[in-house]
Amino acid sequence: MAVGKNKRTSKGKKGGKKKVTDVFTKKEWYDLKAPKMFLVRNFGKTLVTKTIGKKLATDGLKGRIYEVNLADLNNDEDQAHKKIKLCCDHIINKDCYTDFCGLSITRDKLCSLIRKGYTLIEGYTDVKTIDNYQLRMFCIAFTKKRPNQTKTTCYAQTSQIKKIRKKMVDIMNAEASKVLLKDLVKKFIPESIGKEVEKQCKKIYPLQNVLIRKVKILKRPKLDISKLMELHTDSKEDAGKNVKSLPESKEATNILSAELKH
């Protein structure tokens, strides 16, 4: 008697079950290093696929841009409205060394500044630093009520807006063209450029909330690793301070003199 197939038996699926592999076994972590102009030097970690054959892990890291809040970089909550962009330029061991790549203010900060009854004035210009970085800087300002003003609104005239915008452009060019990029970044943090604009435009029309809204890097010079490492190494002045010698106690001097006599 011929034995046929038993149709009641369950059929197996083609291929069977696939092995579940953990994706993170093929990845590795790298530390992110910020330049010395910021207080927090290790600002995070980044993930990248491990080196497989000719495909190096470092190639996947170079050129990555990280957006970090300035409050986290300087441990100051008053600077939480600014965002800094840092670009990974060089990797040593498991450390990624970054450089400044841009700046912007948060959307909620910008929305909180715009109000009815005030004129918004914005100016921008392309500048070049001493170390051949080409930047585009955007400055923003708002009109302010004059002292003892009874009028509820404070709108500036078109001629006044043009004069203020010209002043903005001139000050931004003057401040950026005479310094290195690292010194210019130090000016962005305390808003020294915005304060200078507010001071010089006071005669045209009183201003308030003058700040650098955005900074774009249009062109960067060829990477110089020695200059990049200078940004990440502390200078000799910061390395250590002289400590005053403490006066020797009377008990110690008495013991020493007694030992010398014997």
Curated annotation (Swiss-Prot):
GO terms for cellular component: cytosolic small ribosomal subunit. It is found in: Cytoplasm. GO terms for biological process: translation. The keyword rRNA processing does not apply. Keywords: Cytoplasm, Ribonucleoprotein, Ribosomal protein. Belongs to the eukaryotic ribosomal protein eS1 family. This is Small ribosomal subunit protein eS1.
